């Protein structure tokens, strides 16, 4: 399966439509760079099959995941920007959740709970991935 250009275009258009925090940056990144940066839900070291299953479970949150993946791709290695990227993930996931279901729907609250789960997982488990992205980015520029 995997992510292809059609998926990237579809998710990127949702980022723009929802005006997620960081949407201008997402639109400025060329499609081939987005395809390289976007790996779906979960860290790079998570098996592709698991990330694909997470993508299916949380498909309404994928636009927020795309912004978050770009934040990691352009990591500066600081705690401040790590925390900001994770807070932006939560904010964008909540925007996606509120767009996906009406306020009285259980689905909306389930998606908001997923948003908080993603945020807490990234906050607790993402630091090593953040530093790894920073070091990879520096290696690419050397």
Where are these regions (language model features)?
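Extended terminal accessory/targeting regions
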Residues: 1-142
């Amino acid at each position: 399966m995997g992510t292809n250009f059609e998926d990237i275009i579809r998710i990127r258009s949702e980022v723009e439509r929802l005006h997620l925090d960081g949407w201008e940056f997402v639109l400025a990144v060329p499609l081939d760079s987005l395809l390289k940066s976007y790996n779906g839900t979960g860290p790079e070291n998570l098996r592709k099959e698991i990330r694909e299953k997470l993508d299916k479970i949380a498909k309404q949150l994928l636009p927020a995941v795309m912004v978050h993946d770009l934040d990691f791709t352009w990591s500066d290695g600081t705690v401040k920007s790590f925390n900001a990227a994770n807070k932006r993930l939560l904010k964008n996931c909540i925007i996606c959740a509120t767009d996906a279901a009406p306020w009285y729907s259980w689905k909306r609250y389930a998606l908001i709970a997923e948003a908080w789960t993603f945020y807490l997982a990234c906050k607790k488990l993402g630091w090593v991935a953040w530093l790894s992205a920073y070091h990879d980015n520096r290696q690419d520029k050397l």
